[in-house]
């Protein structure tokens, strides 16, 4: 899909160098957007690949977004490079599996710092510029995990429920400034991490059978929804959660 108003749009993405985040970064680059992203691991090779493919190099800032000071500095650096942020995509997350009875206070705090706290403070950081501009779009990547009541990673599920509450609250608070805040809840997307750590033929087959649409979900299947919510095509949409899941939530 082509969204012509995204050309030269200044975009900031968390976790934009791998998995779904990399697909989102690439999609914006293909639209001609000016993309900056943060990630904890080195993404220089990915940036080289994108520059060669699109002649449009994303600006990579290496940092741990659970460190709010480092996150704020990253946003400032992106602003200095490309100008004020017009689109924020909160994407970075960690869905490591864990047991309720074994979760320590430190694990819980670390999980929430990455999966929820960083989302809030990245919103806070970019909102100042968006208020001044009287425009902006924030897209929070959530998950269908809380809608399904998934077991096996309760801290992550809790954070995703919180993301959706935060999305609605910020949409209401900042709509007066023509800032839109929405969330996307992907289904089980076959990233390299998922395939390496958690996918088995049996689990995948059972999941696909529950989807209304029987196709595997790939990172590229998520990106058009992100572009739509970033563009003026969705100018009357805010405070919403869009499930991109093949219909698995519909079947329960």
Language model features: what each stretch is:
Residues 99-100, 104-112, 207:
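Substrate-binding pocket helix/loop in short-chain dehydrogenase/reductase
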Residues 128, 172-176, 235:
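Alpha-helical segment proximal to the catalytic Tyr-Lys
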Residues 123, 159, 167:
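Active-site helix of classical SDR
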Residues 143:
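Residue(s) in the substrate-gating loop at a strand-loop-helix junction
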Residues 10, 17-18:
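Conserved glycine-rich cofactor-binding loop
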Residues 1-5, 148, 226-227, 238-252:
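Short C-terminal tail/terminal secondary-structure segment
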Residues 31-46:
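Conserved glycine-rich Rossmann-like NAD(P)H-binding loop of the short-chain dehydrogenase/reductase
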């Amino acid at each position: 899909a082509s969204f012509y108003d995204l050309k030269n749009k200044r975009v900031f993405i968390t976790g934009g160098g791998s998995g779904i985040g990399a697909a989102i970064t690439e999609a914006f680059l293909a639209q001609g957007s000016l993309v900056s992203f943060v990630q904890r691991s080195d993404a220089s090779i990915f940036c080289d690949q994108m520059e060669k493919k699109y002649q449009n190099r994303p600006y990579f800032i290496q940092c741990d977004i659970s460190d709010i000071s480092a996150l704020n500095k990253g946003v400032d650096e992106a602003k200095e490079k490309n100008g004020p942020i017009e689109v924020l995509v909160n994407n970075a997350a960690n869905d490591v599996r864990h047991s309720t009875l074994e979760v320590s206070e430190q694990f819980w705090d670390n999980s929430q710092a990455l999966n929820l706290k960083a989302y809030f403070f990245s919103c806070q950081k970019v909102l100042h510029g968006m208020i001044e501009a009287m425009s902006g779009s924030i897209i929070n990547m959530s998950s269908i995990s809380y809608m399904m009541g998934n077991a096996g990673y309760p801290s992550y599920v809790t954070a995703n429920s919180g993301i959706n509450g935060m999305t609605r609250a910020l949409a209401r608070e900042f709509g007066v400034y023509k800032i839109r805040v929405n969330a996307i809840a992907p289904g089980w997307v076959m990233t390299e991490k998922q395939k390496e750590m958690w996918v088995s033929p049996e689990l995948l087959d059972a999941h696909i059978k529950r989807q209304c649409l029987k196709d595997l979900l790939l990172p590229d299947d998520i990106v058009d929804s992100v572009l739509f919510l970033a563009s003026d095509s969705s100018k009357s949409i805010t405070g919403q959660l869009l499930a991109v899941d093949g219909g698995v939530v519909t079947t329960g």
